[in-house]
Amino acid sequence: MTGPAIGIDLGTTYSCVAVYKDNNVEIIPNDQGNRTTPSYVAFTDTERLIGDAAKNQEARNPENTIFDAKRLIGRKFDDRTVQEDMKHWPFKVTNGPNGKPNIEVTFQGEKKTFHAEEISSMVLTKMKEIAESFLGKSVKDVVITVPAYFNDSQRQATKDAGTIAGLNVMRIINEPTAAAIAYGLDKKGGGEKNVLIFDLGGGTFDVSILTIEDGIFEVKATAGDTHLGGEDFDNLLVEHCVRDFMRLNNGKNISSNKRALRRLRTHCERAKRVLSSSTQATIELDSLYEGIDYNTTISRARFEELCNEKFRSTLVPVEKALESSGLDKRSIHEVVLVGGSTRIPKIQTLIKNFFNGKEPCRSINPDEAVAYGAAVQAAILSGNQSEKIQELLLLDVAPLSLGLETAGGVMTVLIKRNTTIPTKKNQIFTTNEDRQEGVLIQVFEGERAMTKDNNLLGKFHLTGIAPAPRGVPQIEVTFDIDANGILNVTAMDKSTGKSEHVTITNDKGRLSQEEIDRMVEEAEKYKEEDEKRRRCVESRHKLENYCYSMKNTLSEDQVKQKLGADEVDSALSTITDALKWVEANQLAEHDEYEDKLKHVEGVCNPLVTKLYQSGAAPGGPDMSGGFPGGAAPPPQSSGPTVEEVD
């Protein structure tokens, strides 16, 4: 049975999943009980780990623990931000086909290459499984959030990641818009409100200004930086500590030691969090590098000084969004903080001062608000009839201007940034040479006057134009942006009716359909491998638990008296051999563990039966022990039932 549609906040550092059920949004906890899950994937000699398990082993396995996929998705390898990030990543990123970045790892002893979409799809698969475990049903439909300032390539790539994860991506929505739903869902009445969403997460930053009235959420303007967040503050703290270590230890530089750097980063991130509630934090690392310990104390003031430039840069998009919306700061009724990095006191102070002392709204959980809004939108799109969400309408905007190149490399804009979407605009163009039989349509996004300074999304040819003097042919170009913010372009020769159409699926950070199909197959294969590994671990635990239970019970004096020392000692010897075998065969197959369990059961179960028949069942009045499984004797084939203990 298929479950309801879910909302996933696919974050740079953490992800969150939610569902709308029984007129309420439920944030779904993972198997560790945490309501957010690290966006981490790790590859070891034996298995693939996702989420908490991946992050927890990061210091031991830095080269094969992948995070920050969101900072790679939809980008080119030679992108300035990718090159900058590579200095901080312990894993290897190389230049792949079409200039797409490839992530290289060693998995089960083999070199493997992944695209960012595949890593993100693994995180999405984990979030899907968390939801399925909670709902007890399979999940297919999803709304995934992206930063409002993500460009076309990044949106397409995120949609592809959902497809690879076996999900039907109903809609891609902007993170601040989703957060606005979380803020405004229960605030019916009270007239029109101008709300500014300040969303500073682990890796991205967005500002959106919305007008909210009676369930209508209309985005007026959006601005941001897809490469600013908590990770950047961590980097500055790490760089400070590396310099400090050099100063204290005669110039010893730990920068090239990935494991030391990763341990330091983990402690710096922890210190950053502590500094949100305390005025100082201590970093203590035993044997950080060449046996040298590193201990230091960071004050909140020092941290703020290190990050001052980055903190202040968050106000630039705020000013830009206000200017684009035509509002001044006094017209903003509420400033809503979203994203874990808004817990930093200095960020809160900067915003408060910018808005002339207005206290920011802290009524929504900054880690969960985006997933909350995504779940509401998922419920609406899947036809949920709840009265609470029936009247809700989202009107979002295109974050960047879209246009095409005309003579001289000029950017001719068809859709201006902050235009409400979905939208459709057309314009007539012509040829600039006599008897020109074809035109090259080049589609760009960006705010600069010349196309060379903007981002090329794609290009296509319209051929078969009837030969005519320059300026005579009429070519109608139509730009159509769908609700996901993804662009379709059509060019038509008005005289012949001949047209060409393209959804922007160029190789600028985009996967081909063949690549997506291959990745879907591989994702299925990895899922099967994970399942196989899980069954192996389960059967190993089953064998170990059975052996230890039997060992404890058979070691009791009363049992030896009832059954005879020889029989008991023989069984205990079999159990000891089995436990030694498990110790030496940690990577055995599921069937091998099962066979070994049957062998041990074959020796022990007759003794169990004999005990029950003699009326001296464990747990009875003359017995202090107890077999797992309670009062009835276990069936010969399966042995006692043991409860799994993690």
Swiss-Prot record:
Signal peptide: none annotated. Keywords: ATP-binding, Nucleotide-binding, Stress response. It comes from the Eukaryota. InterPro entries: ATPase_NBD, Heat_shock_70_CS, HSP70_C_sf, HSP70_peptide-bd_sf, Hsp_70_fam. Residues 613-646 are annotated as: Disordered. The keyword ATP-binding applies. It holds the Pfam family HSP70. The keyword Transmembrane helix does not apply. One of its GO terms (molecular function) is ATP-dependent protein folding chaperone. Transmembrane segments: none annotated. Disulfide bonds: none annotated. Belongs to the heat shock protein 70 family. This is Heat shock 70 kDa protein. It comes from Theileria annulata.
